[in-house]
Amino acid sequence: MLIERSAKAQLLYYLQHFPAVVLLGSRQVGKTTLAKSIFGLTGKPMVFLDMELPSDFEKLQHPEIFLRPLKDHCVVIDEVQRAPALFEALRPLIDEHRVPGRFVLLGSASPSVIRGASETLSGRVAYLELSPLSLPEVQGYFSWRDHWFKGGYPEVLLTPDLPLAQDRLQQFIRTFAERELGALGQEVTPPLLLRLWQMLAHHHGQMLNVQELSASIGMNTRTVNRYLDLLEGGFMTRRLLPWYANLGKRLVKTPKIYLRDSGMLHTLLRLTTPDALIGHPACGASWEGYVVEQIIRTAGPRWDYHFYRTAQFVHCSARSGSASRSRA
């Protein structure tokens, strides 16, 4: 089953106006499938390279030699964070033949990808984030109940056997903690990262208290903050900042923390069935996070998202505001 992604139209739009597009999102979210779905729609021959394949990685050890003859192609480079030096090589190639739609760069870790692209490809690149499947995207295929409980990762959602679906998420979590960050040059202690991740699941939808997390896990606050940045940069968590325009001291300025995928949240909480979720104390927080995430995924990046909370603790999650207007 191939579910049409709402980001497809935006990707094609960017390729008509920018020399390069960086498509960001966590692993298994559907970036490769989306990129391959535009083959034949760009008006150019397309070449696909995967930096996890030794043969493709070798081709780009001297990128100018391989890529210069492809100036009239659209070149898709998957897992580009594996080759951060590539950004520097792309800049002169783009400037030599500056036309829209030359490169699509797929990345699974935003800090390294954005840092490399922003420093070297400024003015040449557009960014597009791909989240797990949103509720509007799966309507007609899955109920909102299934989507809420299993989350939006395509392979998980398309797995009819619930224990197998959760096993896929467990493997995803372990792989991210034990292999992915290390492969990107990040020094982490996987058991501690997993403990923090599970602790965040129990604090889902709450105000982020780094000192409390540090004391509970036995990690110093500096390490906790670094791990929080890695989880957020890997698209696993989201910090929702407070809205405080014109409200001064009445507002609490600490962010709220959410796990971005509801299925991953339920797996970390060891909730194995929808009935177990409904009877669990975390049900309300899970639903809040699910609604917040659907609002953000559906409304898109042109809004800023905040929660509103006064000293009397009356609050409205996911207040979105642009430069000239706001909605609650």
Predicted regions and their residues:
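Accessory nucleic acid-recognition modules appended to NTPase machines
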Residues: L15, L162-A318
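Hydrophobic anchor at the beta1->P-loop junction of P-loop NTPases
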Residues: L23
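Conserved lysine of the Walker
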Residues: K31
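Hydrophobic positions on the alpha1 helix immediately C-terminal to the Walker A/P-loop
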Residues: L34, I38
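Conserved catalytic/switch belt of AAA+ P-loop NTPases
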Residues: F87-P111, S118-E119
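N-terminal pre-Walker A segment at the start of P-loop NTPase domains
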Residues: M1-L12
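Short glycine-rich substrate-engagement loop in P-loop NTPases that contacts/grips substrate
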Residues: K44-C74
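Short regulatory helix/loop adjacent to the ATP-binding pocket of P-loop NTPases
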Residues: P111-A126, F142
